[in-house]
């Protein structure tokens, strides 16, 4: 007896352990987005990254029921607009037939069939739809409108000649079509297509009832059979519970006893203060007490539920995944918080995906029984539900005695598009007809969209590489800066491409660089007014140093801090007061009335209201001069966290960043290091607009710290020993670029030597002119922006967008990102790239062994791919992979957004962030020989996964020969640019003027560094 009990306990423990493994595996398929306050872009299909790109899309589409590409209609619209050309389609088909030879039977080859299917819809039709198209629309009496005129004439002429030898057929057609030769040609072709009976197309998949437990759940079965979704009984309860349990600060009253864990809180909710009173859940309280009496753990409860549902253990993985994907946003957040506790504030309750699964399956059993009883009249055990549904399912209809015209009708459409008349179709055997249809059917919708997508990307890739090739044909002296007056290091962010271009157009002596926006300085930072520290570094990096912003005068700082605390306590008390019964009755009407004045101002005059608010803040909280301080600086006493920031550590950080971007000599008198971030109001996705290299936060503190370290005399001595000799006359300045308003702030200007003050004024003037021109360029993409007007008016518009409460698009973020160029600026200086390119500075001449390139690609590759792929997937299916429109979004638990007051957490990007995006994979152009790139590819698994599996596309520009080669999977193939010149204009504004859509590359003469008559911008 004891032996049998031990065996049962052992088997139960093994099943529970298996369930934990299943849940952990399923968790990888859930959205990995963390709390929305620190939004970091990532590959939406991270769990499939080990697969080739197109295979991953197919697998994910099957699991998530999501779209892998744009629709065929979208791609055909791009064909019509010229965004996909004939050469692009042929290149995509050539890639498809590279591994399999073409085949021809009868008048058509497989490649010709596929070419026609790409350009024209040849859809299968239902019986009812086909009947309508034939009898009502009369589509067999005329040729398709999209048949080219030349083929139309040839078909009519061929049919007339064919009918001359067949007077009986001609007579019948005369009765049916009259004397219209096109109608006769169409009817004759239709008769020829249906003259030979064809077998029906095979079914695509077995009935759903046969797939329950094997990719589909009992919920799916009841939705199909009963027309009611059991999840509608469960989801409102789970959403309210999870919102309260996971809340990080929205709720006025916190859920009690959260420290006991998710399952115990769920159990308490059901048993105590919030009984589940719905009729569907009668008996739940008694069952929960039985669980307590048996001391069942959440894994044991989940296992028991699966057994009651009769789900075989070897099918648990697909079934559990299906259940968790019923609320993927909430389930994904639980999984994320369980494995990344650093995302949460101190004191947060424990979370467990297994406990969530146990709670959901417990409710699911009751909901399934309720729907089955009410809708199907089934009152038996859930284990018998599938068999009951199988018996109750409608038997298949007997074969119809009437002929099946579905496949002949597709043959009829195919023949028209190919220009084949009845004369060519009539002689075809049944086998030849079936072969043509099978070739068409095998080239199904998803395959067609894949090929169209590859053609779409081919067009984009050709445009970009053609632009770079044309730019490289210009003399080197036109593309490089010999004696720079100003040097500005921007983040690699694609939004900086336009600002860099406009700054360079102002003078041939303006030089820019691109480097990851934390500037190689990962820190834990606390600003003067911040409540705590934040990590300003890429996700996955643990900062070793702590930096604090302190006032120069401690007394002034304490006065400001005290005044700020008093004001914050007052506002907090008012906010809490409006939520209480007694004070709320008094405060709400009064405050509501008073708030109408600023509300009207912020709505109708957002820019003016924002300026007034900032002026009041400066009056109430006067700014104080500050400095950056490390509590663990060398020689300091204990205090703070992290390691001491020694001179050697500073020099190592500065040297690595300067070497990465190739700035080791030729320093300008003023070098600006410019971080970036964004500002907006009423925008839960604010963090998604900030610097990804800083973990979804502003990069200004990193830039300021880097400049301070580079100005340190002791650091410069150590840098000189490493071969980086920064002249005494060079001064570094940190700064911050607001990508929403285009504002640029330079820090610590009071430290600039008096000898540089004039140049500093000129630099500020140049940056101001560049940001105005950049705002002008950005405005062409905003539907509400002024179409006419100067740069100053455009700047005022973008400033107003950042302060507008009603603005759903304060800026467009990384929308349009498509390219990453890793190399010297001479590759792209003077090339218009439409703000679509991540620009990463790298000098191959200073990196003969490829070590720097390896470092750069390992950092930039995953980051760029993550941004690009999140935009890709949110664009191709904003319902499944994206967050939908912002308009109904509400902040939920300070974790994410949901639609209205009761929905799943919406992950991914909202519609307003991707509306104008072109979903293409990131094209990474590296200035390196193919040998160097191949060596890095072979050595680094992370690069091999991204490049080899096609998640990003790679092209190399040889530093010696300037030839371009593209990675194909089997090696590198030379790129041959189109035999046509690239357009050239004087300035960027001349090229984008009057255009609101995408603009292809062009050469910009104003950015040329060749000596010419030019006046340096100054104020």
UniProtKB/Swiss-Prot annotation:
Highest taxon of the lineage: Bacteria
UniProt membrane topology term: Peripheral membrane protein
Quaternary assembly: Forms a complex with DabB.
Cofactor(s) of this protein: Zn(2+)
Alphabetized GO MF terms: zinc ion binding
Name of the featured protein: Probable inorganic carbon transporter subunit DabA 1
Functional description taken from the UniProt entry: Part of an energy-coupled inorganic carbon pump.
Cellular location(s): Cell inner membrane
GO cellular component terms given for this protein: plasma membrane
Positions with a binding annotation for Zn(2+): 491, 493, 676, 691
Family note: Belongs to the inorganic carbon transporter (TC 9.A.2) DabA family.
Region (Disordered): 624-643
Lineage, uppermost ranks: Bacteria, Pseudomonadati, Myxococcota, Polyangia, Polyangiales
Gene: dabA1
């Amino acid at each position: 007896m004891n032996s049998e009990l031990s065996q049962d306990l052992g088997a139960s423990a093994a099943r529970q352990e298996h369930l934990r493994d299943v849940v952990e595996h399923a968790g990888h398929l859930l959205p990995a987005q963390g709390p929305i306050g620190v939004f970091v872009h990532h590959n939406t299909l991270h769990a499939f990254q080990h697969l080739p790109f197109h295979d991953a899309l197919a697998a994910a589409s099957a699991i998530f029921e999501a779209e892998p590409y744009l629709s065929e209609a979208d791609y055909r619209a791009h064909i019509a607009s010229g965004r996909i050309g004939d050469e692009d389609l042929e290149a995509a088909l050539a890639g498809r037939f590279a591994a399999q030879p073409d085949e021809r039977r009868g008048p058509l080859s497989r490649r010709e069939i596929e070419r026609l299917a790409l350009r024209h819809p040849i859809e299968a039709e239902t019986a009812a739809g086909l009947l309508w198209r034939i009898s009502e629309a009369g589509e067999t009496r005329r040729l398709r409108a999209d048949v080219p005129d030349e083929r139309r004439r040839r078909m009519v002429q061929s049919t007339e000649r064919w009918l001359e030898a067949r007077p009986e057929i001609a007579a019948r057609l005369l009765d049916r079509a009259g004397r219209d030769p096109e109608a006769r040609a169409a009817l004759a072709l239709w008769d020829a297509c249906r003259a030979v009976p064809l077998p029906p197309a095979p079914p695509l998949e077995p009935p759903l009832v046969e797939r329950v437990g094997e990719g589909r759940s009992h919920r799916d079965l009841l939705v199909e059979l009963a027309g009611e979704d059991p999840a509608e009984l469960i989801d409102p309860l789970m959403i309210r519970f999870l919102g309260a349990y996971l809340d990080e600060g929205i709720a006025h009253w916190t859920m009690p006893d959260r420290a006991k864990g998710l399952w115990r809180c769920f159990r308490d909710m059901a048993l105590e203060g919030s009984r589940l009173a719905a009729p569907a859940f009668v008996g739940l309280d008694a069952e929960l007490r039985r669980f307590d009496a048996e001391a069942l753990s959440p894994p044991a409860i989940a296992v028991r539920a699966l057994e009651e549902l009769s789900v075989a253990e070897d099918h648990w993985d697909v079934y559990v995944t299906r259940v968790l994907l019923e609320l993927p946003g909430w389930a994904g957040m639980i999984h994320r918080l369980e494995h990344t506790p650093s995302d949460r504030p101190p004191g947060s309750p424990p979370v467990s995906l297994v406990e969530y699964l146990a709670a959901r399956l417990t409710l699911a059993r009751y909901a399934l029984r309720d729907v089955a009883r009410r809708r199907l009249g089934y009152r038996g055990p859930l284990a018998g539900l599938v068999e009951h549904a199988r018996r109750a399912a409608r038997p298949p209809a007997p074969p119809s005695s009437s002929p099946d015209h579905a496949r002949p009708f597709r043959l009829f459409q195919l023949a028209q598009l190919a220009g084949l008349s009845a004369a060519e179709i009539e002689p075809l055997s049944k086998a030849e007809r079936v072969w043509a249809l099978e070739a068409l059917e095998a080239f199904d919708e998803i395959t067609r969209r894949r090929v169209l997508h590859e053609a779409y990307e081919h067009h984009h890739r050709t445009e970009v590489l053609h632009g770079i090739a044309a730019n490289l044909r210009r003399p080197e002296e036109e593309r490089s800066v010999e004696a720079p007056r100003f040097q500005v290091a921007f983040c690699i962010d694609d939004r900086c491409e336009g600002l860099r271009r406009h700054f360079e157009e102002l003078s041939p002596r303006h030089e820019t660089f691109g480097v990851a926006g934390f500037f190689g300085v990962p820190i834990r930072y606390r600003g003067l007014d911040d409540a705590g520290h934040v990590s300003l570094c890429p996700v996955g990096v643990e900062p070793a140093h702590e930096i604090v912003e302190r006032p120069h005068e401690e007394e002034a700082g304490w006065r400001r801090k005290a005044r700020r605390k008093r004001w914050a306590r007052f506002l907090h008390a008012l906010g809490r007061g409006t939520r209480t019964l007694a004070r709320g009755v008094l405060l709400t009407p009064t405050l509501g009335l008073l708030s109408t004045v600023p509300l009207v101002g912020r709505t109708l005059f957002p820019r003016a209201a924002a300026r007034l608010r900032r002026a009041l803040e400066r009056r109430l909280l006067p700014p104080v001069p500050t400095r950056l301080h490390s509590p663990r600086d060398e020689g300091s006493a204990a205090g703070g966290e992290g390691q001491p920031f020694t001179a050697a550590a500073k020099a190592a950080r500065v040297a690595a960043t300067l070497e990465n971007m190739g700035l080791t000599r030729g320093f300008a008198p003023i070098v600006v290091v410019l971080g970036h971030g964004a500002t907006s109001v009423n925008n839960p996705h604010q963090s998604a607009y900030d610097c990804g290299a800083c973990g979804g936060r502003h990069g200004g503190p990193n830039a300021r710290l880097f400049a301070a370290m580079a100005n340190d005399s002791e650091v410069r001595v150590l840098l000189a020993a490493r071969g980086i000799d920064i002249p005494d006359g060079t001064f570094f300045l940190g700064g911050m670029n607001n990508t929403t308003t285009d504002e640029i702030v330079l820090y610590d200007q009071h430290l600039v030597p008096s000898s540089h003050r004039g140049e500093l004024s000129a630099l500020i003037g140049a940056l101001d002119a560049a940001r105005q021109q950049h705002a002008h360029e950005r405005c062409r993409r905003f539907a509400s922006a002024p179409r006419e007007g100067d740069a100053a008016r455009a700047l005022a518009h973008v400033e107003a967008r950042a302060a507008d409460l009603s603005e759903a698009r304060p800026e467009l973020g990384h929308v349009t990102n498509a390219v990453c160029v890793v190399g010297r600026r001479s590759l792209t200086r003077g090339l218009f790239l439409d703000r679509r390119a991540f620009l990463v500075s790298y000098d191959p001449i200073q990196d003969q062994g490829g070590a720097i390139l390896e470092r750069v690609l390992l950092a930039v590759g995953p980051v760029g791919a993550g941004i690009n792929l999140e935009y890709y997937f949110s664009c191709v299916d904003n319902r499944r992979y994206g967050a939908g429109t912002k308009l109904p979004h509400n902040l939920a638990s300070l974790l994410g957004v949901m639609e209205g007051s009761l929905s799943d957490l919406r992950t991914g990007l909202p519609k307003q962030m991707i509306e104008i995006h072109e979903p293409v994979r990131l094209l990474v152009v590296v200035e390196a020989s193919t040998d160097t790139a191949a060596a890095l590819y072979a050595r680094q698994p992370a690069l091999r996964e991204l490049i080899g599996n096609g998640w990003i596309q790679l092209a190399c520009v040889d530093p010696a020969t300037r030839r371009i080669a593209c990675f194909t999977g089997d090696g590198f193939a030379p790129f041959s640019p189109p035999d046509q010149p690239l357009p050239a204009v004087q300035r960027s504004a001349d090229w984008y003027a009057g255009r609101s859509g995408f603009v292809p590359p062009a050469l910009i003469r104003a950015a040329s560094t060749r000596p010419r008559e030019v006046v340096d911008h100054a104020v």
